């Protein structure tokens, strides 16, 4: 077979034989590091990879040849938890945060999520589209090729649908692949204050059926937290969503452990998010139910909290984990997955191999794209992040700098030395 593109002489390729399930426990410590590696691409797919000189049959008169001495290649990075589409920003709350006002106290004062809800409700489709596109551009420049994007800053049907429509439009227009999550249960809207059940009924009866019918989202999520939605309320919504055919996620055990992990396990959610306050019993329940733990260390960093999710304990117990930005205007205003990956080492005490597995193959399973992306594997799409680094440890050791040299998306050179092509 003659390749369309042949990428050769990488210092290292980060490869993996996809086992057919998210990596758990000791599996997360394993990878195949190919020295002097090459990747052959045809019709947007990986058709061969190996070490040394490529087979002669891969090279034709039209084959594009590129050499990458001094560089490494990983699968395209996957950010599987973002709140991508929103209006406004919340830097005006930064002084309060520095003064020690808590996240929940800011929310109780009408700020936080509710502040962004007001800004998003007043924002036009074009405003939201352009703002979200800029964030996606930034992510792409940092090696991200697939992104999960939630609604949740409307808390009414008109605005929630506008957010989902923006995601759908960007999925068509932007190189990054987007996976949509419906999260109208992100907070209790002011017009339903004191009556969350009534709001959940509106979501179940009036919103979810339309989202499903119009194929606006693949996943449904809820914020199960003290002073937001209880475990029973979360179970009520997610069980109805599951009956309608949605895959499930749940924000759980971020600030307090109030039963969200139990709901995730009972309903076989794909993932439980945050988990800073998870208990040993909660870890065991998620492992037993096969729920992926999606950890968001940049949120803990941004909130200036001391308690990070117990990633080391989770992996050692046999759990599958992912790492994501939680990109949002309040608790985590970043879109930099390289920073998150570095926090995975510095604050969660994971190894570079564990982090790379978390943000590639496990993240692919988390967004239900494992058949297409998540590993440098023959037959998968050629989503490739190329780092200006001599080995896979270097991007973690040399932190706070964008080390992306190039990005390939579906076999096309999409980013070249800081420019989107």
Swiss-Prot record:
Q: Summarize where Fe(3+) binds, as residue positions.
A: 81, 83, 251, 326
Q: Which UniProt keywords apply?
A: Cytoplasm, Histidine metabolism, Hydrolase, Iron, Metal-binding, Zinc
Q: Which cofactor does it need?
A: Zn(2+); Fe(3+)
Instruction: Quote the Pfam families the UniProt record gives.
Output: Amidohydro_1
Q: What does this protein do?
A: Catalyzes the hydrolytic cleavage of the carbon-nitrogen bond in imidazolone-5-propanoate to yield N-formimidoyl-L-glutamate. It is the third step in the universal histidine degradation pathway.
**PANTHER family given in the database record:** IMIDAZOLONEPROPIONASE, IMIDAZOLONEPROPIONASE-RELATED
What is the protein name stated in its UniProt record?
A: Imidazolonepropionase
This chain's source organism reads Streptococcus pyogenes serotype M1
